[in-house]
Amino acid sequence: MKSELQLRRRDLALLEALALRVRLIGQRQAADAFWHGHCANARRRLGQLASNGMLTRNLVNAQPLPEIIEPVVRWQPGQVAPDAGHVAYQVQHRWKFRALRPTVVYFPTVKTISQFGGSERSQTKLTQITYDLGVTAIWLRYASQNNNTTAMWIGEDILAPTRIREKLPDAALVDQQGQPKLLIEFAGSYGPERIADFHDDAAARGLPYHLW
């Protein structure tokens, strides 16, 4: 009989993030963030977590992410609206010459989502893998700068029930009462109209945002 896997602090941090903060994580992302860049160690441990029903491993096609260092736009109520056309050019230009390539990603299982109090979610579309990896990269960026941010970050799937008939950001940093205090959106390769729509929604609700 297979003995139960003993979860380490690192395992719990990763599983909690996948249940509550982000939808998936790339194997390379996990290695860099949780195993100090040691791919072999990361691959071995992720495989153990998958074998024990906590993660699902998939090989998918995704574009290599551009360097994600800081938001393209930081906006607060009272400031002038960003130039949507200029922002769209910036975010679209960064994807130049980034062809799809095989990428190993890990998803949380229903067991993991339930264990950490996450919300039921629809299956990620293959066409959305690159985008979701971008959201994960943003979360990892915040987490590397401030550990407190990881607890304040609430992902889209957790936010969804509270945003009926409202635009849904990729994530939000929330206060102790669970109210959004900063919206977070990965612009991907958004066009001007979508960027303007996101800004208008945030401005109408008086919420600052970071657009990456």
Task: Go through the PLM ranges and name each one.
Residues 34-35, 120-135:
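A short, highly charged nucleic-acid-interacting micro-segment common to nuclease
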Residues 117-119, 183:
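Short, charged, solvent-exposed linker or helix-capping segments at domain edges/interfaces
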Residues 1-114:
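Nuclease-adjacent, charged terminal/linker segments that flank catalytic cores
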Residues 141, 179-182, 186-212:
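Catalytic cores of nucleic-acid endonucleases
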Residues 25, 41-44, 129-133, 137, ...:
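Short, well-structured alpha-helical interface segments that form or flank functional binding sites
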Residues 58, 73, 78-96, 125-131, ...:
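Active-site metal-binding core of divalent-cation-utilizing nuclease and nuclease-like domains
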